[in-house]
Amino acid sequence: EISECLVGSEMCIRDRIKEGAKCNIFFSAGVAQMDELQNGYDGGSVVDGTRVDLLNNQVCLVTYKNSGTAVTGFAEISKAKNMALADRTVPVGQYTRAALVNAKMVEGDASNPQDISDSDISKALDGLEINSCANVGAVASAVAEGANEIGTVYYSDTFGYENQLDIIEKLPNSLTGDVIYPIAALKGDSTTSDELEAAKEFIAYLQTDEAMSVFEKYHFSVKE
């Protein structure tokens, strides 16, 4: 039984854990956020031997149904009137910024995408209006509702939006880098042995064929 689930951007969840929120498992859409906890934090740590790179995802460029956009691929996003873009502190925003650098559309360091601001992107893309969104869900909603012409989301986030979103392009990993979802058990000062064992068992279950079939239904792929 899961008594509480922390939901939000990886940065917010990571910070809450660092500030003392009790958590037995951390499941992240970004490797960097897991790495920070792996290095230890006040009152807790990642349990050795429990970290697993569980899933892959893919970043997609999307538009709303019947938008009539002139954008036919990632290289043409400057043709849009505006774009919903996740904040540079969250993984999908970082993957998108890395892709822009690797595609030579924006100057910067692809290994430090958090340093690339919305204004940097707008200037490089002919003044493209950027709607900064707190997380990937906000991007999906902004585009699906027609508030923004295009946006970047995970492929998994298009599930349930089939009647509202069109995928313009699935970005190759050569641009974004691997989109990996790591999971690990956490141990804090108040973690009991039963809680730790349950966390390990749950992580093991998520690696079974039964669990993977559910993930694949929602557009995730299995990390080999």
Predicted features by range, described:
Residues 1-12:
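Short, small-residue-biased leader/transition segments that mark boundaries at the very start
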Residues 7-8, 22, 147:
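Alpha-helix C-terminal capping/helix-to-coil transition sites in glycosyltransferase folds
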Residues 14-19, 30-31, 38-39, 55-57, ...:
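Exported/periplasmic ABC-transporter solute-binding proteins
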Residues 6, 27, 152:
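Short aromatic/basic micro-patch
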Residues 24-40, 45-53:
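Short beta-strand-centered segments that line the small-molecule binding cleft or hinge
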